[in-house]
Swiss-Prot record:
Originating species: Phycomyces blakesleeanus (strain ATCC 8743b / DSM 1359 / FGSC 10004 / NBRC 33097 / NRRL 1555)
MF GO annotations: orotate phosphoribosyltransferase activity; orotidine-5'-phosphate decarboxylase activity
Name the record gives this protein: Orotidine 5'-phosphate decarboxylase
UniProt gene name: pyrG
Keyword Isomerase: no
SMART domains per record: OMPdecase (SM00934)
Length: 267
């Protein structure tokens, strides 16, 4: 049987057990995009401006809300409005990494109240399976989805080998809430599983940034490695006057790579 990785997003949406994943696949097919833009800026104005510019071209907007120096509740309200306007999901790249009881409060409470507005979040598996249980207590009733960090794109990352293997096993035991991974290649091994893989470190023009980040092309990520969503940051918003043009460029490259993958594996 064909792995779900190689099926169309529509087919995967129809059979996926996770509500957040279904919404994502339907959105990707509807907008014809597998692009996520990582908006790592430090002011409310910049974040909202970039979100509005890239919104028409992305399936997911990835935020680091805790680096925004002038964060307030209005920022969240405006982000939610932009998500509705442009039809995208919000992914707060929080990378939770504490025991279950602590992350539960970090996710639901505090200044940011992440669970109330972010459709997707992620976590390290270093603390063990309790982190998934804790986040799930908050996120599952809200229809949220969790990604586990199985692999990272930075040079020298320790997320490999048995760490990655154990992360996948944790995901298999928690499919109601965990719908995928931050990783560098597909994680599906069996016909009855369908993990979404979102991949950072995607660039069309450069191979690294001097701080350990390593870049691959959309073709390498989608076709050769079997990933599903390309995450692009500075390659899109690094030149303020080219944000829309670069968004279109990466969206087209990512979507064409997806179409090529589907064609290659058609029965």
């Amino acid at each position: 049987m064909m792995l779900n990785t190689y099926k169309s997003y529509t087919e995967r949406a129809e059979q996926h057990p996770n509500a957040c994943a279904r919404s994502l696949f339907e959105l990707m097919e509807r907008k014809k995009t597998n692009l996520s833009v990582a908006v790592d800026v430090t002011t409310k104005k910049e974040l909202l401006s970039i979100a509005d510019s890239v919104g028409p071209y992305v399936c997911v907007l990835k935020t680091h809300i805790d680096i925004v120096e002038d964060f307030d509740k209005d920022l969240v309200a405006q982000l939610e409005a932009l998500a509705k306007k442009h039809d995208f999901l919000i992914f707060e790249d929080r990378k939770f990494a504490d025991i279950g009881n602590t992350v539960k409060h970090q996710y639901e409470k505090g200044v940011y109240k992440i669970a109330s507005w972010s459709h997707i979040t992620n976590a390290h598996t270093v603390p063990g399976e309790g982190i998934i249980k804790g986040l799930g207590e908050v996120g599952l009733p809200l229809g949220r989805g969790l990604l586990l960090l199985a692999e990272m794109s930075s040079k020298g990352a320790l997320t490999k080998g048995s760490y990655t293997t154990e992360s996948v096993e944790m995901a298999r035991r928690n499919k109601d809430f965990v719908f995928g991974f931050i990783a560098q290649h597909k994680m599906n091994e069996y016909p009855d599983e369908d993990f979404v893989v979102m991949t950072p470190g995607v660039g069309l023009d450069i191979k690294g940034d001097g701080l350990g980040q390593q870049y691959r092309t959309p073709h390498e990520v989608i076709v050769e490695s079997g990933c599903d969503v390309i995450i692009v940051g500075r390659g899109i918003y690094g030149k303020p006057d080219e944000v829309e043009a670069q968004s279109k460029r990466y969206r087209e490259a990512g979507w064409n790579a997806y179409l090529e993958r589907v064609r290659m594996h058609k029965a």
